[in-house]
Amino acid sequence: MSQHVGHGRKPRTPGPPVRSIRPFKSSEQYLEVMKEDLAEWLRDLYGLDIDAANFLRVLETGLVLCRHANTVTEAALAFLAEAPERVQKIPMPQVGVFCNGAAQPGTFQARDNISNFIQWCRKEMGIQEVLMFETEDLVLRKNVKSVVLCLLELGRRAWRFGVAAPSLVYLEEEIEEELRRDLDLPSPDPPPPVPPARRPCHFHNLDQMVQSLVSHCTCPVQFSMVKISDGKYRVGDSNTLIFIRILRSHVMVRVGGGWDTLGHYLDKHDPCRCTSLSHKPGSFLKPPGPPVQHEVKVQDGPSQPQPLMTISRSQSPLPPVDWKTYTSSSRKLRPPTPSSSGPRSEFPARARTPREMAPFLRSQEKPTLSQRMSSPGPQLSSPCRGPDLQSTLSERRVNRSPGELPRGRTPTSWVPKEADSQGAHTKAPIPQRLQIPETTSKKTPARGPSPPPRSSSLASPHTIWLPDQGASPEISEPMSAQSSSPGKGLTKIPIRLSPARPPTPGRGSLGTEGGGSMQRGSLSSRALAGNLDRSTHGHHSVDVSKDHQKVIQISSGTEDPRSLGTQERKERYTSLPLGRTREPALYDNLKEELVANMKLLEVGAACTQGTRSQAIPRSGVYVPSLGGMWPEPRGPYDKVIQELVQGPPRLLKVDLKAWKVGSECLPRPIVNPGSPKEEQVSRERGTRRKARPSAQGTTVKTTSPARGQDCSTLPVSANLKAPTHSCSDPSSDKAKVCLGKGKRTLRKPQKVPSIYKLKLRPRIRPRRDHRPEKRPSRIPKPLVYPFLGPARTAPGSRLLKATLGGTGGDVNGVGKKEEEKKKETSISLESSIQPSESREPMQLDGTPLPPEEESWV
């Protein structure tokens, strides 16, 4: 059985994926039942005005709780006086509770009363901590369940002393007695008191109530509950036995040491009810009807109708699924109506909403093969909208049996196009695979993986619609072609227009009032015929006329491709009723569109017949506002073409060390041939060319400038920035500094600096003495080899150097010869001493070790 879900749901704010449809959780039901039972218990004991609604409000002062504690203590002392031998078997309270009678709700006195009651329950009654509650649980309603369970346990224990207990305690005793009889168990040592006589339970009513609760699930395979005896049932596939009792108007189930409602028990154990989509609570009040699946209302807005989403949840094999149309939420469905035979530019017409589309797809009638062959005309002769169409189609659907539904349905999708810049609401169908514009179609058993659909009751228009401006120029209305197989209807085949001509930016299909035809050379019938021959699918073929010069008829009123005349088409179809004010405006709008489309077609024909330079290129951006003509190449376009024609520029190798902007790019003065300035310039060129060794892998891309262009427009590589000022003498220091500024690469330094100047750690760290009296120096001591003599004389040489330096600084009248001797002596001493700045260890040949081989003590 095919199921239809909501189509085209409107996007809304993201919420939880699945939301419970119950007004409150079913787990809270047994708490309400217990509060009702405890309220009746306290009302009978103390004559209070208490019920389930004001149960916690009466208890929040602690007065009733302390009063009941004192009552239980008195009953225990009286019971102890009668049977003192039971003191060892049953814990009995010996002391009562102090209570402040002037306590108000929410005050500290009320909290003190509740705290005294809690302490009495723990100390005197021995109630387990699992069943206890705290002061905040009652005052602030933080944990109502613990309060209810504690009072119920107190009622069980106090019943042993002869205090009246809640009704649930009496039901528990009945079930315990039944179990002892069935299992032949002995009675407890202190026999429990006899429960008071109560109204007998009508198990016939119990069976009816259980059957009513279980039958809320209408799945083919329901959760099994087998009756063993009165009030005893076996549930599910296991041998679990449950005891069910009626407490006032509730059906209670004995679970472990507590109670639960049958509805909540089924929600937890029934596989069908454990799903996220539960039953509606309103379904309990409905009269029993024919078995249906689970129905869940899906509502997008408060003012919109509510379709039913039917969900099948059963353990039996499901029937074959008949898939229907599905589109994502970003797309909206628009069914083709009989009003679509009118002019396509009628944008005031109301589009069908997705809410109306879902019943339309579900209730459309499917004609048989004989009906389709005998009456190729449409079955809906007048436009029907809204509830009239839905009621008519739903009446037709009632008479159809479920076995009539075919399999292998090909999904169809109707997607509205985007409105163009002029605001026309033109809708055009976009085909998916093989598309049928009508929503109804009849299928035969598939012979292939995806059989194409046949034509439906509504005849397809034999028209070709021109695409909009914003739409793709290759997608058009699928043409209807005669199928080669006998007994089959028409097959819709999408047509791709030839990309050789530009798309016409019209807003709708070209047509006249009488359905006349127009002949234009811009639409090539030969291209259409070729595309039709290539678009055959499966065993379906397309019959295309052999005459390639046949005019393609573009009309807006034709609906039946096998009809003979315009008069017959007018008789078969009923036009849309137009008002007196809308009709002239519609005709004026049609005339404007026809004139605009004719002009665009003439421009397109002129472009195809013109030269190749005026034709629209196959790539790039086509701007329809230019009148269908591509702008002529002029201005910067000529410069680009000229630069591309000249070919790739010549690449020059440039040395990075001696690189700078060549003198060709600088403004050269006008020099006569043979002048000394020209000779100097040529000499400098020769020197620079000799000093340019080929750098490894470094080239600068340059472009030879045009004759009329300035040298300053020469492009330079972005990685190397040329200096703005020229260096006249490349051998000078200034030239070296100038050349160094333009470099961005690392070069090998002449002298490797110290490791600590580079802020690098040595590979071998020095040993550290952590004794407080011997702290190592922060300056590491270099390693000195014993066979290196000059290194041992380092302190003396330093002293001698200092002496020489001091003498040379103090004496001013020394001759040049003495100064030269002192300089030679100091230079020889400095060369023999290890450099203190670098602190590098020496090898045997006197060369410094590389930085990788340094070691420190």
UniProtKB/Swiss-Prot annotation:
Comp. bias regions, Polar residues:
301-316, 366-382, 695-716, 826-836
The protein in question is named: GAS2-like protein 2
Which segments show compositional bias classed as Basic and acidic residues? 534-550, 559-572, 676-685, 815-825
Which gene carries the instructions for this protein?
Gas2l2
Top-level taxonomy: Eukaryota, Metazoa, Chordata, Craniata, Vertebrata
Q: Where is the composition biased (Gly residues)?
A: 508-518
Q: Where is this region: Disordered?
A: 1-21, 282-572, 670-716, 759-857
Task: Name a single GO biological process.
Answer: negative regulation of microtubule depolymerization
Which residue numbers delimit the GAR domain?
A: 201-273
GO CC annotation terms, alphabetical: actin filament; ciliary basal body; cytoplasm; microtubule; microtubule plus-end; plasma membrane; stress fiber
Protein family membership: Belongs to the GAS2 family.
CDD domains in alphabetical order: CH_GAS2L1_2
**What segment(s) does the record annotate as region Interaction with ADORA2A?**
432-857
Where in or outside the cell it occurs: the entry states: Cytoplasm, Cytoskeleton; Cell membrane; Cytoplasm, Cytoskeleton, Stress fiber; Cytoplasm, Cytoskeleton, Cilium basal body
